[in-house]
Amino acid sequence: MPKKFGRIHLVVMDSVGIGAAPDADKFFNHDVETHEAINDVKSDTIGHISEIRGLDVPNLQKLGWGNIPRESPLKTIPAAQKPAAYVTKLEEISKGKDTMTGHWEIMGLNIQTPFPTYPEGYPEDLLEKIEEFSGRKIIREANKPYSGTAVIEDFGPRQLETGELIIYTSADPVLQIAAHEDVISREELYKICEYVRSITLEGSGIMIGRIIARPYVGEAGNFERTDGRRDYALSPFAETVLEKLYKAGIDTYSVGKISDIFNTVGVKYDMGHNHNDMDGVDRLLKAMTKTEFTEGFSFTNLVDFDAKYGHRRDVEGYGKAIEDFDGRLPEIIDAMNEDDLLMITADHGNDPSYVGTDHTREYIPLVIFSKSFKEPKVLPVGHFADISATIAENFSVKKAQTGESFLDALV
C-alpha cells in the first residue's frame, strides 16, 4: 500500500492535558502543606488555564482545539466553525502518569506494571554505593519526594558549602540529582548519573525508571536550573513503533528529550536537547527543512510546559508558554510539504492550578493537520497508542502491542 503521507511530525506538548481521565480517581496528588492525598478527578490542565488566566491561541483555535469533546467548552478557546484539522482526545490505558509511560504508550506499548516509586526515599545501601563511587556525601534530608525548585532552595546553600549531593525523588519513578555548577561540573554530574543508571536496571534489586541530572546556578534565594538536564532512561521492554520504523530503514528524527526517553532505541538522527521550548521549535524546523529529510518521522518533546510551569504550579507562565508555542505554529505549517502530516498532542496532564506538584491523570488532546485535508472533523475519542498505530500503517510496518489506526479516516 502506498504511503498516504511522506513525512509525519509528532509534537508532544509535555503535560498539556485536557481534562480528567475516567480512572483519575485512582491517581493522586499530595497537598504540600497537609500531605493529604487528593485524587486527580477535578484536574483539567488546558481547561483551568483557559478559565483562570485565559488563552489567546488563534492558531490552535483555527485547528480545532476548542472543538475537542469536553463536558464543558473551553472558556477562552471557542470552537472553530470549520476546523482546519482533525481533533479528538485520547485516553491512557497504562498504569502510570509519568513521562516514560506516556511516551512509550504513544509509541504502542501497554505498561500494566507501573514503574516502582519511592515515596519514602531511596534505600540506604543505594545511597552508600553512590557516595563510594562519587567520593561525595549525600544530604539525607533531601532524600524524599520533593519539588525540584524547592529542594535547591532548601539545600542549595548547604551544597555550596559542603559539596554534598542533593538526591531526591517525586511521585514519578525518577531519581534526580541536583548539582550547582560552581561546585559539581556537568561532566562530573553526568558521570554520577551514568553510574546510578548502571546499578538500577531491571534485575538489579532496585529498578528506577529514569535517572535525571539537574544542574543549576545562582546564589541562595536566586537559584535557577539550567538547560543541562539529562535523562537516563531504561530501554523499552518491547519494540515500539519508533524502533520498528528504524529497523525498516525509515528515517527517524528526535528533538528534545525523546532520545533520552527511549534510551536512543529507534532514533536515527538526534537533533539534540532543547535549551527551551522555542529552541525546540527551532530544532524541529531545522529537521523539517533538511534537504535529505524527504520521507520519514520526526518526534519532538517540548518539556517546559511541564518542567518550568506545571510542577511549579505557575498558571501564568504555563499559559504564556502555550501562547508562545501557538505563535510558532505558522512556521511549522509553512515548513510542511503537501503530503506531510502534523500531529500535536501531550503525554499526561500537569494542571498548574491543582493541589500538589505532580502530574495529573488526564486525557490528552490530539490535533491532526495536513495541507491536503479537504474537510477535517472531530474524530471519536481513542487511546494514546492510536497515534503510533496510524504512523505504523502509513509506513507499512506492524503496530506495537496496542493501538488502532485512524489513517483511513484522514481524507
From Swiss-Prot:
<dbReference type="GO" id="GO:0008973">
    <property type="term" value="F:phosphopentomutase activity"/>
</dbReference>
<protein>
    <recommendedName>
        <fullName>Phosphopentomutase</fullName>
        <ecNumber>5.4.2.7</ecNumber>
    </recommendedName>
</protein>
<comment type="similarity">
    <text>Belongs to the phosphopentomutase family.</text>
</comment>
<dbReference type="InterPro" id="IPR017850">
    <property type="entry name" value="Alkaline_phosphatase_core_sf"/>
</dbReference>
<dbReference type="GO" id="GO:0043094">
    <property type="term" value="P:metabolic compound salvage"/>
</dbReference>
<comment type="function">
    <text>Isomerase that catalyzes the conversion of deoxy-ribose 1-phosphate (dRib-1-P) and ribose 1-phosphate (Rib-1-P) to deoxy-ribose 5-phosphate (dRib-5-P) and ribose 5-phosphate (Rib-5-P), respectively.</text>
</comment>
<feature type="binding site">
    <location>
        <position position="347"/>
    </location>
    <ligand>
        <name>Mn(2+) 1</name>
    </ligand>
</feature>
<dbReference type="GO" id="GO:0006015">
    <property type="term" value="P:5-phosphoribose 1-diphosphate biosynthetic process"/>
</dbReference>
<dbReference type="Pfam" id="PF01676">
    <property type="entry name" value="Metalloenzyme"/>
</dbReference>
<keyword id="KW-0479">Metal-binding</keyword>
<dbReference type="GO" id="GO:0006018">
    <property type="term" value="P:2-deoxyribose 1-phosphate catabolic process"/>
</dbReference>
<feature type="binding site">
    <location>
        <position position="359"/>
    </location>
    <ligand>
        <name>Mn(2+) 2</name>
    </ligand>
</feature>
<dbReference type="GO" id="GO:0009117">
    <property type="term" value="P:nucleotide metabolic process"/>
</dbReference>
<feature type="binding site">
    <location>
        <position position="14"/>
    </location>
    <ligand>
        <name>Mn(2+) 1</name>
    </ligand>
</feature>
<feature type="binding site">
    <location>
        <position position="348"/>
    </location>
    <ligand>
        <name>Mn(2+) 1</name>
    </ligand>
</feature>
<dbReference type="InterPro" id="IPR024052">
    <property type="entry name" value="Phosphopentomutase_DeoB_cap_sf"/>
</dbReference>
<dbReference type="InterPro" id="IPR006124">
    <property type="entry name" value="Metalloenzyme"/>
</dbReference>
<dbReference type="GO" id="GO:0000287">
    <property type="term" value="F:magnesium ion binding"/>
</dbReference>
<feature type="binding site">
    <location>
        <position position="306"/>
    </location>
    <ligand>
        <name>Mn(2+) 2</name>
    </ligand>
</feature>
<dbReference type="GO" id="GO:0030145">
    <property type="term" value="F:manganese ion binding"/>
</dbReference>
<dbReference type="GO" id="GO:0005829">
    <property type="term" value="C:cytosol"/>
</dbReference>
<keyword id="KW-0464">Manganese</keyword>
<comment type="pathway">
    <text>Carbohydrate degradation; 2-deoxy-D-ribose 1-phosphate degradation; D-glyceraldehyde 3-phosphate and acetaldehyde from 2-deoxy-alpha-D-ribose 1-phosphate: step 1/2.</text>
</comment>
<dbReference type="InterPro" id="IPR010045">
    <property type="entry name" value="DeoB"/>
</dbReference>
<keyword id="KW-0963">Cytoplasm</keyword>
<keyword id="KW-0413">Isomerase</keyword>
<feature type="binding site">
    <location>
        <position position="311"/>
    </location>
    <ligand>
        <name>Mn(2+) 2</name>
    </ligand>
</feature>
